[in-house]
Amino acid sequence: MEPLRELRRQAARAGIDLYPVSGFRDFTRQAAIWNAKFRGERPVLDRAGQPLDALALEAPERIDALLAWSALPGASRHHWGTDFDVIDRAALPEGYDVQLVPAEYEPGGVFARLAYWLDENVERFGFFRPYATDRGGVQPEAWHLSHAPLASVALAALTPAVLAEAIATAE
């Protein structure tokens, strides 16, 4: 995708090694992530980005907690091939374990410089951050980029009926 290559080239000129750590994710992979979190096998965060004991929650509350950070299988923007999560590899200390949590992208965080650069530049290349602010659903994800021209087409096609069918036909 040429817009992504150009975004990476311009980031490199600013000393940033913009690297997608997560891109396309099919339904099966998203379901595996979702189910592992639901079963307490993967970390679950509260709305403040702090670890949460998901197994201590009743199913409806657990689902709500998961939806703050993880899309329902079938509804993930990662399914479209237009969205990805990015880090700055140049900013990584040796041995650092990337978490993709807000603290990494906030002032003082390992990827704060990347977040600022993206704030100033991402739209020039046709990208945007679909989870830039808290609108009461998915929590802000400074690391999540979406290619607007392609994602807008996919979003228009994602109707409740399409999502219901995807879930109903899944194992």
Residue map of PLM features:
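Cell-envelope/glycan interface and biosynthesis
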Residues: M1-E171
